[in-house]
Amino acid sequence: MSGSASFEGGVFSPYLTGRLPPWAGVRQNVMGSTVDGRPVQPANSSTLTYATLSSSPLDAAAAAAATAAANTILGMGYYGSIVANSSSSNNPSTLAEDKLLVLLAQLEALTQRLGELSKQVAQLREQTESAVATAKSK
């Protein structure tokens, strides 16, 4: 496919390997590694593990990008289900919507953190004012 981005790979999750019989050779709860040494979570772990199948020089970058995307989706809370259920087409509007959902989740997290910091600043201001008032009264 020239002129377009593609990612050939597989997604390994607990659902895919959890019901295979022991004779299938699936090792459970064992940390593995790829050919180039990157760690691979066990197939029954709670994290998603991505593996590329092509042999292009961009494999490492594609795997790193896929891992970062998986970590972002897992950290998004309830937005994760929206993104995970969306289609994986290369439609620009779908990709833009996915990026927007990620940005909205990050904005919500930052807004919550800002609220917490504002409360801490208000408490420190009150403590400082009471300490100054106590010092002046002595």
UniProtKB/Swiss-Prot annotation:
Pfam families: Adeno_PIX. One of its GO terms (molecular function) is hexon binding. The keyword Metal-binding does not apply. The keyword Coiled coil applies. Keywords: Capsid decoration protein, Capsid protein, Coiled coil, Host nucleus, Host-virus interaction, Virion, Virus entry into host cell. InterPro entries: Hexon_assoc_IX (IPR005641). One of its GO terms (biological process) is symbiont entry into host cell. Residues 100-127 form a coiled coil. Induction: Expressed in the intermediate phase of the viral replicative cycle. GO terms for cellular component: host cell nucleus; viral capsid, decoration. HAMAP family: ADV_CAP9. Structural component of the virion that acts as a cement protein on the capsid exterior and forms triskelion structures consisting of three molecules that stabilize three hexon trimers at the center of each icosahedral facet and fixes the peripentonal hexons. Dispensable for assembly. During virus entry, recruits the anterograde motor kinesin-1 to the capsid docked at the nuclear pore complex thereby subjecting the docked capsid to a pulling force. Homotrimer. Interacts with hexon protein; this interaction tethers the hexons together. Self-interacts with adjacent proteins. Interacts with kinesin light chain KLC1; this interaction leads to capsid disruption at the nuclear pore complex during virus entry into host cell. This protein is only encoded by mastadenoviruses, and may therefore play a role in mammals tropism. Three N-terminal domains of hexon-interlacing protein form triskelions between hexon capsomers. This is Hexon-interlacing protein. It comes from Human adenovirus B serotype 3 (HAdV-3). The lineage of its organism: Viruses, Varidnaviria, Bamfordvirae, Preplasmiviricota, Tectiliviricetes. The gene is IX.
